[in-house]
Amino acid sequence: MEFSVGGVEVVLMRGDITEVEADAIVNAANSYLEHGGGVAGAIVRKGGQVIQEESREWVRKHGPVPVGDVAVTSAGRLKAKYVIHAVGPRCGVEPIEKLAEAVKNALLKAEELGLVSIALPAISTGIFGCPYDAAAEQMATAIREVAPALRSIRRILVVLYGEEAYQKFLEVFKKHLPGGRL
């Protein structure tokens, strides 16, 4: 399903984010950038240990990434140029609004890097425990608010692993984003 927001194409799709062609892939990360399981583990397995090594170096230099913020590394063997590590909230621990903040910061970082396309997973829905619909609301809100200000980013892919995630996100995005078409 495709949407258009402020001249930016937003594509909701099922799939494996490590296989997507985009200038940047967003990783659902923890503050210490230790990429063990879920999307983070898959990104390191597919992209190579260099992503984990660069992440540890980033934390050594800058300290842990605050919830709602991002860090950037190379993408190793992935098709992307960069991995933008976005730290979303743990539901029930940190405010859900930090998820929208993380998405906005990921989009703005990609814009700062002059990128054209970015792929986002369902941040905070894995071990961080946020329900798909709540995460989708935060992500749709962030995209709707930031997209009109983007100049280099022309395409945002929201890549969902599994049918349940896709259906929940589709339901929410249809409500919050204009111009949905198959």
Curated annotation (Swiss-Prot):
Disulfide bonds: none annotated. Residues 1-177 form the Macro domain. It comes from the Archaea. Gene3D superfamilies: Leucine Aminopeptidase, subunit E, domain 1 (3.40.220.10). Pfam families: Macro. NCBIfam families: PRK00431.2-3 (NF001667). This is Uncharacterized protein PAE1111.
